[in-house]
Design a protein with these regions (language model features):
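Alpha-helical scaffold segments in soluble metabolic enzymes
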Residues: 21, 25, 76, 113, ...
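Alpha/beta enzyme core
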Residues: 1-86, 92-110
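Residue-level recognition of conserved structural "scaffold" positions that shape functional pockets
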Residues: 70, 96-97, 118, 134, ...
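A short, charged, Gly/Pro-tolerant segment at domain boundaries
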Residues: 142-148
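Small/polar glycine-rich anion-binding or flexible loop at a beta-alpha turn
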Residues: 91-95, 117, 148
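C-terminal helical cap(s) of enzyme catalytic domains, especially alpha/beta-barrels
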Residues: 45-59, 101, 114-138
Length: 148
């Protein structure tokens, strides 16, 4: 960080035993923002060819299946460091995004869902706004980290 003039966003891998170790190290190193989670490492086998389906044997798993893991890791990191977090991993609805905010993400990012629903981000924003109105939140920041 001491050589960077721009904000430093550290994207953390979920392929660790304890995400808080990485979060603390990134915070101590001067990260301005944490981004988590990246993809989980997975493997697919082509049962007809009886070999690996991916050229590198393993690859990144993303999408709805990783969401509960991402929520847990955002929660753990948010409770370990005082660094803003961009929560990502399997977000495909307003409910998914709200979960991330409630456990401590200051912002969210949508990835895989954009491939099959080009309006997903707009739908999520609309859903968050409706949730805020229904639950009397004046701003998104009022929601951040209230689930302890």
């Amino acid at each position: 960080k001491k050589h960077a003039k721009q904000p430093v966003i550290m994207k953390l891998s979920p392929n660790v035993t304890d995400i808080t170790v990485m979060a603390r190290a990134a915070g101590a190193g001067g990260a301005d923002v944490l981004s988590l989670i990246n993809t989980l490492t997975g493997m697919k086998i082509d049962i007809n060819r009886k070999t690996f389906a991916l050229a590198n044997k393993t690859g990144g798993v993303s999408g709805p299946a990783v969401h509960p893991i991402a929520v847990r890791m955002v929660y753990e990191a948010a409770n370990a460091v005082n660094v803003p977090i961009i929560g990502m991993g399997g977000i495909e609805s307003a409910e998914d995004a709200i979960e991330m905010l409630l456990v401590g993400a200051s912002a969210v990012s949508v990835g895989t869902a954009n491939f099959y629903n080009p309006t997903v981000t707009m739908d999520i924003v609309d859903g968050i706004e409706a949730y805020m109105k229904q639950n009397h939140f004046a701003s998104v920041q009022d929601m951040v980290g209230i689930v302890k």
